[in-house]
Protein backbone atom coordinates (compact mmCIF):
# COMPACT_ATOMS: atom_id res chain seq x y z
CA UNK A 1 0.00 0.00 0.00
CA UNK A 2 1.47 3.34 -1.02
CA UNK A 3 1.83 6.47 1.09
CA UNK A 4 -1.12 8.36 -0.40
CA UNK A 5 -3.51 5.47 0.19
CA UNK A 6 -2.39 5.14 3.81
CA UNK A 7 -2.89 8.87 4.39
CA UNK A 8 -6.38 8.68 2.90
CA UNK A 9 -7.50 5.64 4.89
CA UNK A 10 -6.04 6.89 8.19
CA UNK A 11 -7.65 10.28 7.54
CA UNK A 12 -11.04 8.61 7.10
CA UNK A 13 -10.69 6.96 10.51
CA UNK A 14 -9.76 10.26 12.15
CA UNK A 15 -12.77 11.95 10.57
CA UNK A 16 -15.32 9.59 12.07
CA UNK A 17 -17.37 11.13 14.89
CA UNK A 18 -16.80 8.05 17.05
CA UNK A 19 -13.27 7.39 15.80
CA UNK A 20 -11.28 8.26 18.94
CA UNK A 21 -10.85 6.10 22.04
CA UNK A 22 -9.81 8.51 24.78
CA UNK A 23 -6.65 10.59 24.74
CA UNK A 24 -3.13 10.94 26.17
CA UNK A 25 -0.65 13.78 26.58
CA UNK A 26 2.56 13.60 24.59
CA UNK A 27 5.48 16.06 24.37
CA UNK A 28 5.17 17.85 21.05
CA UNK A 29 6.78 21.11 19.98
CA UNK A 30 8.07 21.87 23.49
CA UNK A 31 4.71 21.38 25.23
CA UNK A 32 2.53 18.57 26.53
CA UNK A 33 -0.39 18.21 24.17
CA UNK A 34 -3.52 16.15 24.72
CA UNK A 35 -4.03 14.03 21.63
CA UNK A 36 -6.83 11.58 20.82
CA UNK A 37 -6.16 7.86 20.58
CA UNK A 38 -7.38 5.86 17.59
CA UNK A 39 -7.56 2.21 16.66
CA UNK A 40 -5.68 1.97 13.37
CA UNK A 41 -5.58 -1.26 11.34
CA UNK A 42 -2.13 -2.84 11.45
CA UNK A 43 -2.31 -3.17 7.67
CA UNK A 44 -2.01 0.63 7.41
CA UNK A 45 1.17 0.84 9.48
CA UNK A 46 4.81 0.87 8.39
CA UNK A 47 7.69 -0.06 10.71
CA UNK A 48 10.51 2.40 11.26
CA UNK A 49 13.60 0.55 10.04
CA UNK A 50 15.81 2.97 11.98
CA UNK A 51 14.04 2.25 15.25
CA UNK A 52 16.56 2.61 18.07
CA UNK A 53 16.01 -0.98 19.16
CA UNK A 54 17.32 -2.42 15.88
CA UNK A 55 19.41 0.45 14.48
CA UNK A 56 22.68 -1.51 14.61
CA UNK A 57 21.05 -4.41 12.75
CA UNK A 58 19.48 -2.42 9.93
CA UNK A 59 22.60 -0.29 9.47
CA UNK A 60 24.72 -3.46 9.31
CA UNK A 61 22.46 -4.98 6.67
CA UNK A 62 22.45 -1.80 4.61
CA UNK A 63 26.24 -1.77 4.74
CA UNK A 64 26.06 -5.11 2.91
CA UNK A 65 23.94 -3.43 0.20
CA UNK A 66 20.70 -4.96 1.48
CA UNK A 67 17.84 -2.68 0.52
CA UNK A 68 15.29 -2.65 3.37
CA UNK A 69 11.97 -1.29 2.18
CA UNK A 70 9.66 -1.26 5.18
CA UNK A 71 6.61 -0.80 2.94
CA UNK A 72 7.07 -4.18 1.25
CA UNK A 73 6.12 -7.56 2.69
CA UNK A 74 9.73 -8.74 2.54
CA UNK A 75 10.95 -5.63 4.36
CA UNK A 76 8.19 -5.89 6.95
CA UNK A 77 9.00 -9.54 7.68
CA UNK A 78 12.72 -8.75 8.03
CA UNK A 79 12.09 -5.89 10.46
CA UNK A 80 9.71 -8.06 12.50
CA UNK A 81 12.40 -10.73 12.78
CA UNK A 82 14.97 -8.15 13.90
CA UNK A 83 12.53 -6.76 16.48
CA UNK A 84 11.80 -10.23 17.82
CA UNK A 85 15.46 -11.27 17.95
CA UNK A 86 16.40 -8.06 19.79
CA UNK A 87 15.02 -9.54 23.04
CA UNK A 88 13.12 -12.86 22.64
CA UNK A 89 12.60 -13.33 26.38
CA UNK A 90 10.99 -9.94 26.93
CA UNK A 91 9.01 -10.28 23.71
CA UNK A 92 7.48 -13.56 24.88
CA UNK A 93 6.44 -11.95 28.17
CA UNK A 94 4.82 -9.00 26.40
CA UNK A 95 3.13 -11.30 23.90
CA UNK A 96 1.60 -13.34 26.71
CA UNK A 97 0.37 -10.11 28.31
CA UNK A 98 -1.19 -8.99 25.01
CA UNK A 99 -3.03 -12.30 24.68
CA UNK A 100 -4.44 -11.90 28.20
CA UNK A 101 -5.34 -8.21 28.44
CA UNK A 102 -4.54 -6.68 25.06
CA UNK A 103 -2.40 -3.65 24.20
CA UNK A 104 -1.62 -1.63 27.34
CA UNK A 105 0.64 1.17 26.08
CA UNK A 106 -0.51 3.51 23.32
CA UNK A 107 1.76 4.03 20.31
CA UNK A 108 2.54 7.06 18.15
CA UNK A 109 2.41 7.17 14.34
CA UNK A 110 2.63 9.83 11.62
CA UNK A 111 -0.36 10.68 9.43
CA UNK A 112 1.03 8.35 6.73
CA UNK A 113 1.33 5.41 9.14
CA UNK A 114 5.05 5.40 10.02
CA UNK A 115 5.43 4.05 13.56
CA UNK A 116 7.35 6.51 15.74
CA UNK A 117 6.81 4.72 19.04
CA UNK A 118 5.52 1.16 19.34
CA UNK A 119 7.32 -0.84 16.64
CA UNK A 120 7.84 -3.78 18.98
CA UNK A 121 4.24 -3.65 20.24
CA UNK A 122 2.87 -3.55 16.69
CA UNK A 123 5.00 -6.58 15.78
CA UNK A 124 3.72 -8.52 18.80
CA UNK A 125 0.12 -7.56 18.08
CA UNK A 126 0.47 -8.92 14.54
CA UNK A 127 2.07 -12.13 15.83
CA UNK A 128 -0.76 -12.50 18.35
CA UNK A 129 -3.43 -12.27 15.65
CA UNK A 130 -4.69 -8.77 16.48
CA UNK A 131 -5.92 -6.44 13.75
CA UNK A 132 -5.67 -2.99 15.36
CA UNK A 133 -3.09 -0.77 17.02
CA UNK A 134 -4.10 1.85 19.60
CA UNK A 135 -2.15 4.97 18.77
CA UNK A 136 -1.88 8.73 18.63
CA UNK A 137 -1.73 10.06 15.07
CA UNK A 138 0.52 13.06 14.48
CA UNK A 139 -0.79 15.56 11.94
CA UNK A 140 2.48 15.50 9.96
CA UNK A 141 4.52 13.06 7.90
CA UNK A 142 8.14 12.26 8.69
CA UNK A 143 9.31 14.54 5.87
CA UNK A 144 7.22 17.51 7.04
CA UNK A 145 8.77 17.82 10.51
CA UNK A 146 11.77 15.46 10.78
CA UNK A 147 13.49 17.20 13.71
CA UNK A 148 10.43 17.26 15.96
CA UNK A 149 9.65 13.64 15.13
CA UNK A 150 13.28 12.66 15.80
CA UNK A 151 13.07 14.43 19.14
CA UNK A 152 9.82 12.66 20.05
CA UNK A 153 11.09 9.29 18.89
CA UNK A 154 14.36 9.60 20.82
CA UNK A 155 12.59 10.78 23.98
CA UNK A 156 10.35 7.72 23.94
CA UNK A 157 12.91 5.17 22.74
CA UNK A 158 15.75 6.28 25.00
CA UNK A 159 13.69 7.16 28.07
CA UNK A 160 14.77 5.73 31.40
CA UNK A 161 12.30 2.83 31.28
CA UNK A 162 12.99 1.84 27.67
CA UNK A 163 16.76 2.19 27.29
CA UNK A 164 17.39 -0.62 29.77
CA UNK A 165 15.83 -3.14 27.38
CA UNK A 166 17.87 -2.03 24.36
CA UNK A 167 21.04 -3.60 23.01
CA UNK A 168 23.80 -1.50 24.67
CA UNK A 169 25.33 -0.56 21.31
CA UNK A 170 22.13 1.16 20.13
CA UNK A 171 22.56 4.22 22.36
CA UNK A 172 26.02 4.89 20.92
CA UNK A 173 24.68 4.67 17.39
CA UNK A 174 21.74 6.91 18.26
CA UNK A 175 24.01 9.62 19.70
CA UNK A 176 26.27 9.42 16.64
CA UNK A 177 23.31 9.49 14.25
CA UNK A 178 21.81 12.58 15.87
CA UNK A 179 25.17 14.36 16.04
CA UNK A 180 25.80 13.70 12.35
CA UNK A 181 22.41 15.22 11.58
CA UNK A 182 23.55 18.42 13.24
CA UNK A 183 21.55 18.15 16.46
CA UNK A 184 23.41 20.10 19.22
CA UNK A 185 24.92 18.02 22.04
CA UNK A 186 22.74 19.80 24.62
CA UNK A 187 19.60 18.81 22.72
CA UNK A 188 20.73 15.20 22.29
CA UNK A 189 21.31 15.05 26.05
CA UNK A 190 17.78 16.29 26.75
CA UNK A 191 16.19 13.93 24.26
CA UNK A 192 18.09 10.90 25.56
CA UNK A 193 17.72 11.82 29.22
CA UNK A 194 21.47 12.05 29.76
CA UNK A 195 24.04 14.68 30.76
CA UNK A 196 26.03 16.55 28.14
CA UNK A 197 29.24 14.82 29.27
CA UNK A 198 27.57 11.42 28.88
CA UNK A 199 26.58 12.19 25.29
CA UNK A 200 30.13 13.33 24.55
CA UNK A 201 31.35 10.04 25.99
CA UNK A 202 28.88 8.04 23.87
CA UNK A 203 30.06 9.79 20.70
CA UNK A 204 33.74 9.31 21.62
CA UNK A 205 33.26 5.61 22.36
CA UNK A 206 31.33 5.22 19.10
CA UNK A 207 34.35 6.74 17.35
CA UNK A 208 36.54 4.01 18.85
CA UNK A 209 34.00 1.38 17.81
CA UNK A 210 34.00 2.66 14.22
CA UNK A 211 37.81 2.65 14.17
CA UNK A 212 37.79 -0.95 15.45
CA UNK A 213 35.43 -2.05 12.66
CA UNK A 214 37.65 -0.29 10.13
CA UNK A 215 40.68 -2.13 11.60
CA UNK A 216 38.89 -5.45 11.09
CA UNK A 217 37.84 -4.50 7.57
CA UNK A 218 34.11 -4.61 8.27
CA UNK A 219 33.07 -0.95 8.43
CA UNK A 220 29.49 -0.40 9.45
CA UNK A 221 28.84 -4.01 10.50
CA UNK A 222 27.74 -2.98 13.98
CA UNK A 223 26.68 -6.48 15.00
CA UNK A 224 30.40 -7.18 15.57
CA UNK A 225 30.33 -4.81 18.55
CA UNK A 226 27.98 -7.03 20.57
CA UNK A 227 29.30 -8.05 23.99
CA UNK A 228 32.25 -5.66 23.84
CA UNK A 229 30.87 -2.39 25.26
CA UNK A 230 32.92 -2.28 28.49
CA UNK A 231 36.21 -2.83 26.68
CA UNK A 232 35.49 0.04 24.30
CA UNK A 233 34.64 2.36 27.20
CA UNK A 234 37.90 1.46 28.95
CA UNK A 235 40.01 1.81 25.80
CA UNK A 236 38.48 5.15 24.81
CA UNK A 237 39.29 6.62 28.22
CA UNK A 238 42.85 5.34 27.97
CA UNK A 239 43.46 6.70 24.48
CA UNK A 240 41.99 10.10 25.32
CA UNK A 241 44.13 10.33 28.48
CA UNK A 242 47.37 9.17 26.84
CA UNK A 243 47.28 11.06 23.54
CA UNK A 244 49.52 14.13 23.52
CA UNK A 245 52.33 12.47 25.51
CA UNK A 246 51.49 14.37 28.72
CA UNK A 247 49.85 11.71 30.91
CA UNK A 248 51.60 10.43 34.05
CA UNK A 249 49.99 6.99 33.84
CA UNK A 250 52.10 5.48 31.02
CA UNK A 251 55.85 4.88 31.30
CA UNK A 252 58.17 7.90 31.21
CA UNK A 253 59.00 9.13 27.73
CA UNK A 254 56.19 7.32 25.93
CA UNK A 255 55.19 8.61 22.49
CA UNK A 256 51.93 8.79 20.58
CA UNK A 257 53.06 5.90 18.38
CA UNK A 258 53.21 3.80 21.58
CA UNK A 259 49.57 4.75 22.16
CA UNK A 260 48.80 3.65 18.60
CA UNK A 261 50.38 0.26 19.34
CA UNK A 262 48.27 0.06 22.50
CA UNK A 263 45.11 0.68 20.50
CA UNK A 264 45.89 -2.00 17.89
CA UNK A 265 46.81 -4.60 20.50
CA UNK A 266 43.66 -3.77 22.46
CA UNK A 267 41.58 -4.25 19.30
CA UNK A 268 42.94 -7.80 18.98
CA UNK A 269 42.06 -8.53 22.60
CA UNK A 270 38.60 -7.02 22.11
CA UNK A 271 38.12 -9.20 19.05
CA UNK A 272 38.63 -12.37 21.10
CA UNK A 273 36.45 -10.89 23.86
CA UNK A 274 38.98 -10.51 26.65
CA UNK A 275 37.30 -8.48 29.35
CA UNK A 276 37.35 -7.46 32.98
CA UNK A 277 40.58 -7.43 34.94
CA UNK A 278 42.56 -9.28 32.25
CA UNK A 279 41.82 -6.54 29.73
CA UNK A 280 42.42 -3.72 32.22
CA UNK A 281 45.86 -5.11 33.07
CA UNK A 282 47.08 -3.86 29.70
CA UNK A 283 46.83 -0.13 30.40
CA UNK A 284 44.13 0.75 32.95
CA UNK A 285 44.49 2.40 36.34
CA UNK A 286 47.59 3.56 38.19
CA UNK A 287 50.95 3.30 36.48
CA UNK A 288 52.18 0.53 38.77
CA UNK A 289 49.18 -1.66 37.98
CA UNK A 290 49.40 -2.07 34.21
CA UNK A 291 51.83 -3.06 31.47
CA UNK A 292 51.82 0.34 29.78
CA UNK A 293 53.19 1.86 32.99
CA UNK A 294 56.58 0.15 32.66
CA UNK A 295 58.60 0.61 29.47
CA UNK A 296 60.45 -2.70 29.68
CA UNK A 297 57.32 -4.69 30.48
CA UNK A 298 55.30 -2.91 27.79
CA UNK A 299 57.89 -3.45 25.07
CA UNK A 300 58.14 -7.13 25.96
CA UNK A 301 54.33 -7.51 25.96
CA UNK A 302 54.02 -5.57 22.68
CA UNK A 303 56.75 -7.46 20.83
CA UNK A 304 55.44 -10.85 21.92
CA UNK A 305 51.95 -9.93 20.74
CA UNK A 306 52.91 -8.64 17.29
CA UNK A 307 55.30 -11.54 16.72
CA UNK A 308 52.56 -14.09 17.39
CA UNK A 309 49.47 -12.37 15.99
CA UNK A 310 50.81 -11.32 12.59
CA UNK A 311 51.22 -14.84 11.13
CA UNK A 312 47.59 -15.59 12.02
CA UNK A 313 46.36 -12.41 10.37
CA UNK A 314 48.45 -13.09 7.28
CA UNK A 315 46.71 -16.46 6.95
CA UNK A 316 43.14 -15.14 7.25
CA UNK A 317 40.91 -15.23 4.20
CA UNK A 318 39.32 -12.06 2.86
CA UNK A 319 35.87 -11.31 4.26
CA UNK A 320 33.06 -12.57 2.05
CA UNK A 321 30.49 -9.81 2.40
CA UNK A 322 28.12 -11.64 0.06
CA UNK A 323 27.61 -14.48 2.53
CA UNK A 324 23.98 -15.03 3.51
CA UNK A 325 24.44 -14.65 7.27
CA UNK A 326 27.32 -12.22 7.65
CA UNK A 327 27.05 -11.95 11.44
CA UNK A 328 27.39 -15.72 11.92
CA UNK A 329 30.19 -15.80 9.34
CA UNK A 330 32.16 -13.02 11.08
CA UNK A 331 31.64 -14.55 14.51
CA UNK A 332 32.97 -17.86 13.20
CA UNK A 333 35.92 -16.03 11.65
CA UNK A 334 36.71 -14.42 15.02
CA UNK A 335 36.44 -17.81 16.75
CA UNK A 336 38.86 -19.37 14.27
CA UNK A 337 41.23 -16.43 14.81
CA UNK A 338 41.25 -17.22 18.53
CA UNK A 339 41.60 -20.98 18.03
CA UNK A 340 44.69 -20.45 15.90
CA UNK A 341 46.26 -18.54 18.80
CA UNK A 342 46.36 -21.72 20.92
CA UNK A 343 49.35 -24.01 21.37
CA UNK A 344 49.32 -27.81 21.42
CA UNK A 345 48.13 -27.72 25.04
CA UNK A 346 45.16 -25.54 24.15
CA UNK A 347 46.47 -22.33 25.71
CA UNK A 348 46.17 -19.10 23.73
CA UNK A 349 49.15 -16.79 23.40
CA UNK A 350 46.71 -14.00 24.32
CA UNK A 351 46.35 -15.62 27.75
CA UNK A 352 50.02 -16.53 28.01
CA UNK A 353 51.10 -12.96 27.26
CA UNK A 354 48.72 -11.47 29.82
CA UNK A 355 49.67 -13.94 32.55
CA UNK A 356 53.44 -13.74 32.11
CA UNK A 357 53.52 -9.94 32.10
CA UNK A 358 51.04 -9.69 34.94
CA UNK A 359 53.55 -11.76 36.90
CA UNK A 360 56.24 -9.21 36.03
CA UNK A 361 53.99 -6.48 37.41
CA UNK A 362 53.72 -8.41 40.66
CA UNK A 363 57.48 -8.87 40.76
CA UNK A 364 57.93 -5.14 40.27
CA UNK A 365 55.58 -4.42 43.16
CA UNK A 366 57.64 -6.77 45.36
CA UNK A 367 60.98 -5.15 44.51
CA UNK A 368 61.65 -4.45 48.20
CA UNK A 369 60.91 -8.05 49.20
CA UNK A 370 63.99 -9.89 47.83
CA UNK A 371 63.41 -13.13 49.74
CA UNK A 372 59.91 -13.46 48.31
CA UNK A 373 61.11 -12.89 44.75
CA UNK A 374 64.08 -15.24 45.11
CA UNK A 375 61.84 -18.00 46.49
CA UNK A 376 59.56 -17.55 43.49
CA UNK A 377 62.55 -17.82 41.17
CA UNK A 378 63.76 -20.98 42.91
CA UNK A 379 60.31 -22.56 42.63
CA UNK A 380 60.19 -21.73 38.93
CA UNK A 381 63.63 -23.22 38.27
CA UNK A 382 62.83 -26.34 40.30
CA UNK A 383 59.77 -26.90 38.14
CA UNK A 384 61.87 -27.23 34.95
CA UNK A 385 62.12 -30.72 33.46
CA UNK A 386 65.81 -30.85 32.60
CA UNK A 387 65.31 -34.13 30.77
CA UNK A 388 62.96 -32.58 28.23
CA UNK A 389 64.45 -32.08 24.77
CA UNK A 390 63.47 -28.41 24.81
CA UNK A 391 65.76 -27.82 27.79
CA UNK A 392 68.90 -28.01 25.62
CA UNK A 393 67.60 -25.56 23.02
CA UNK A 394 70.09 -22.70 22.33
CA UNK A 395 67.59 -20.06 23.42
CA UNK A 396 67.03 -21.85 26.73
CA UNK A 397 70.78 -22.13 27.31
CA UNK A 398 71.13 -18.40 26.66
CA UNK A 399 68.48 -17.68 29.27
CA UNK A 400 70.25 -19.91 31.80
CA UNK A 401 73.49 -18.04 31.18
CA UNK A 402 71.58 -14.81 31.72
CA UNK A 403 70.28 -16.11 35.05
CA UNK A 404 73.82 -17.03 36.04
CA UNK A 405 75.07 -13.54 35.15
CA UNK A 406 72.37 -11.96 37.28
CA UNK A 407 73.07 -14.13 40.34
CA UNK A 408 76.83 -13.55 40.05
CA UNK A 409 76.24 -9.81 39.84
CA UNK A 410 74.10 -9.95 42.98
CA UNK A 411 76.67 -11.93 44.93
CA UNK A 412 79.54 -9.74 43.73
CA UNK A 413 77.72 -6.64 44.91
CA UNK A 414 76.88 -7.72 48.44
CA UNK A 415 78.80 -10.92 49.29
CA UNK A 416 82.13 -11.42 47.41
CA UNK A 417 83.23 -14.22 49.78
CA UNK A 418 80.03 -16.14 49.02
CA UNK A 419 80.69 -15.61 45.34
CA UNK A 420 84.15 -17.19 45.66
CA UNK A 421 82.64 -20.14 47.50
CA UNK A 422 80.11 -20.47 44.71
CA UNK A 423 82.90 -20.43 42.09
CA UNK A 424 84.81 -23.14 43.97
CA UNK A 425 81.69 -25.31 44.13
CA UNK A 426 81.08 -24.81 40.44
CA UNK A 427 84.66 -25.78 39.58
CA UNK A 428 84.43 -28.90 41.74
CA UNK A 429 81.17 -29.90 40.10
CA UNK A 430 82.67 -29.99 36.59
CA UNK A 431 83.16 -33.54 35.29
CA UNK A 432 86.33 -33.45 33.22
CA UNK A 433 85.50 -36.69 31.42
CA UNK A 434 82.48 -34.96 29.89
CA UNK A 435 84.76 -32.51 28.10
CA UNK A 436 86.81 -34.89 25.90
CA UNK A 437 85.58 -33.24 22.71
CA UNK A 438 86.38 -29.77 24.05
CA UNK A 439 89.71 -30.64 25.72
CA UNK A 440 91.76 -27.85 24.16
CA UNK A 441 89.14 -25.20 24.89
CA UNK A 442 88.84 -26.36 28.49
CA UNK A 443 92.62 -26.21 29.02
CA UNK A 444 92.64 -22.65 27.73
CA UNK A 445 89.85 -21.72 30.16
CA UNK A 446 91.77 -23.34 33.04
CA UNK A 447 94.86 -21.26 32.20
CA UNK A 448 92.68 -18.16 32.18
CA UNK A 449 91.24 -19.10 35.60
CA UNK A 450 94.78 -19.52 36.94
CA UNK A 451 95.76 -16.04 35.73
CA UNK A 452 92.65 -14.46 37.23
CA UNK A 453 93.12 -16.30 40.54
CA UNK A 454 96.80 -15.26 40.73
CA UNK A 455 95.90 -11.60 40.17
CA UNK A 456 93.10 -11.77 42.76
CA UNK A 457 95.50 -13.27 45.29
CA UNK A 458 97.94 -10.39 44.76
CA UNK A 459 95.15 -7.80 45.05
CA UNK A 460 93.75 -9.27 48.26
CA UNK A 461 97.20 -9.55 49.91
CA UNK A 462 97.79 -5.92 49.07
CA UNK A 463 94.71 -4.80 51.05
List PLM regions with ranges.
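C-terminal amphipathic alpha-helical interaction region
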Residues: 383-463
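Active-site-proximal acidic segments at structured loop/helix or strand boundaries
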Residues: 210-233
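Amphipathic, charge-rich alpha-helical segments that serve as recognition/docking helices
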Residues: 79-84, 130-214
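Long, charge-rich C-terminal accessory regions
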Residues: 225-409
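Regular secondary-structure segments
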Residues: 176-180, 378, 382, 428
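Short, charged/polar connector segments at secondary-structure boundaries
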Residues: 1-134
Amino acid sequence: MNKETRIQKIGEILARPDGSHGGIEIPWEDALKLMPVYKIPLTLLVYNKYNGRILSRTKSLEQQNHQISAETEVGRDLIEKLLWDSDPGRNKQTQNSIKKIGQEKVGIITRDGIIIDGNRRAMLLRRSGNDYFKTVVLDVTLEQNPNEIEKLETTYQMGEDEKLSYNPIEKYLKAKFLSQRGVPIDDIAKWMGETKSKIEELIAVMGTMDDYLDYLGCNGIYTQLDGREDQFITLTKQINNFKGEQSKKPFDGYKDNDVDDLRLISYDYIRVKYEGKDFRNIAYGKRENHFFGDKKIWQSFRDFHFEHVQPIKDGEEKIDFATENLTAYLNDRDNRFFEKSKNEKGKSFFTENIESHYQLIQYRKSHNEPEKLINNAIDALDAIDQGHKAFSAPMVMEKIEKINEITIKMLRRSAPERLLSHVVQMLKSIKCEDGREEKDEMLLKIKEIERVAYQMEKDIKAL
